[in-house]
């Protein structure tokens, strides 16, 4: 599903502009790892597929997937949640942008 290609095939003239780019943070705070291992984190918010990929990598690299059973995962979309679904979460919730506080209820 490439939207640009679909428009071009439909006869539209398209000019692509890259709004922004992101780079993964390669420096994981060791306090975060210790807090996850100690089950001190109750909720994690994930706002993008890329962030979900990074979180999955951190969890698997540090072998803390078994420490997530009392943590709730709040994701901005089902696509984001599906990336992390295979891990043991107490709960997975989907929220809308701006409604993060409502997902805490």
List where the protein language model places each region.
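Conserved beta-alpha
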Residues: 1-105
